[in-house]
Amino acid sequence: MSVMYKKILYPTDFSETAEIALKHVKAFKTLKAEEVILLHVIDEREIKKRDIFSLLLGVAGLNKSVEEFENELKNKLTEEAKNKMENIKKELEDVGFKVKDIIVVGIPHEEIVKIAEDEGVDIIIMGSHGKTNLKEILLGSVTENVIKKSNKPVLVVKRKNS
């Protein structure tokens, strides 16, 4: 029985470890991989934290509701993600992949698992740690939860040793 990984899910938070994982995604082209689902999840919990923080500081504006502020923040974060993903998408297309890019707002590990299922990917390739990169822990919480909850194979790429 031969295992083929034709369709890859590459979730990124644009961290250094995610960049290292991208190199591994590209290497799968030599193994006949054809398509990459490029995913960025805007963490809805972070948006809620920023809402509270901004309201406490009063920078949300006197005439804005929490909902308006939340929508502005989601739009801003989505626009930033689109710009970063455009470069990654081009890199992947340059090595011959068909690329579908997705940006969603939600709980990162839940969205990664859901999109892996919805898109019918063969493997998930992701970094071991995200932006927090706590050195004391073996795996980041998003990666750990994806491993626990997904029925897809997960290739976890380690961060650089420091």
From Swiss-Prot:
Q: What Gene3D superfamilies does its record include?
A: HUPs (3.40.50.620)
Among Pfam families, the record links this protein to:
Usp
Provide the protein's localization: Cytoplasm
Q: Required cofactors, per record?
A: Mn(2+)
Q: Which SUPFAM superfamilies match?
A: Adenine nucleotide alpha hydrolases-like
Task: Provide any one GO MF term from the record.
Answer: ATP binding
Keywords assigned = ATP-binding, Cytoplasm, Nucleotide-binding
Residues given in the record as ATP binding sites: P11, V41, G127, S128, H129, G130, K131, T132, N133, S141, V142, T143
Highest taxon of the source? Answer: Archaea
Give an example GO cellular component term for this record.
cytoplasm
Copy out the cofactor comment: Binds 1 Mn(2+) ion per subunit.
Family statement drawn from the similarity comment of this UniProt entry: Belongs to the universal stress protein A family.
Subunit and interaction comment? Homodimer.
Give the protein name, as stated in the record: Universal stress protein MJ0577
- Species in which this protein is naturally found: Methanocaldococcus jannaschii (strain ATCC 43067 / DSM 2661 / JAL-1 / JCM 10045 / NBRC 100440)
